[in-house]
Amino acid sequence: MLSADFLHLEKDVEMVNGCADIFHLDIMDGVLVPNISYGFPVIEAIAKKAVKPMDAHLMIVHPEKYFERFAKTGVQMMSFHLEAADRDGNDPAEMLDMIKSYGIKAGLAINPDIAPERVFPYLDKADYILVMSVFAGFGGQKFIETTYDRIRAIKSEISRIGSSCQIEVDGGVSPSNASALAAAGAEILVAGSAVFKAADPASTVEVMRAVR
């Protein structure tokens, strides 16, 4: 929803309701990432109209302080960055358990400069791994091509240990790379600019859904 038209937010919410699978909510604090997005009033407004699950991507420091508050907004998925846990010396496994305690799917996100092997210890705990294919903080960035290898590495380990963990990809996702991302092992594709700036957003979503 970072690329939505916030002056006409309800229109874009209805568009997502009609053609997509989830609402991806990018929460930025200007500390962990160099940008500020939106907070609880916007999320609560979206929640009033959303009929599809809401996925909160927390690009913030001390995310654990806000897990309960986000849970109360009605989100069904919530991820935090491994970098945030590292920064505070927190155990990502414990943080994943905290999210799950609210009955929410728990995800662990990593930026492009974090080795994919760093998430391997948590693949039996996380419901999904969010692989950033751009550096978190801004929409409309160019897709980083090494993302495919990162996805394949994580998918291979998921298969090796028999985990049900899924892979979500966010950043520069579009119809031009959706098929290759799915082939690499991604199950959840987050597209912002490619959808909201398209002449026909619903058709764009349908093209990407067809690759699954």
PLM regions and their residue ranges:
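Conserved N-terminal beta1-alpha1 strand-loop-helix module at the mouth
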Residues: 1-79, 83-93, 98, 106, ...
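Short acidic loop-to-helix transition motifs that present clustered carboxylates
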Residues: 113-115, 174
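Glycine-rich beta-strand-to-loop/alpha-helix junction loops that act as flexible
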Residues: 167-173, 190-194
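Residue microenvironments linked to proteolytic maturation
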Residues: 102
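Short glycine-rich anion-binding loops that position phosphate/pyrophosphate groups of nucleotides
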Residues: 134-136
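Internal catalytic-core helix/loop-beta-alpha segment
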Residues: 105-109, 113
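Acidic, divalent-metal-coordinating active-site segment for phosphoryl/phosphodiester hydrolysis
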Residues: 172-184
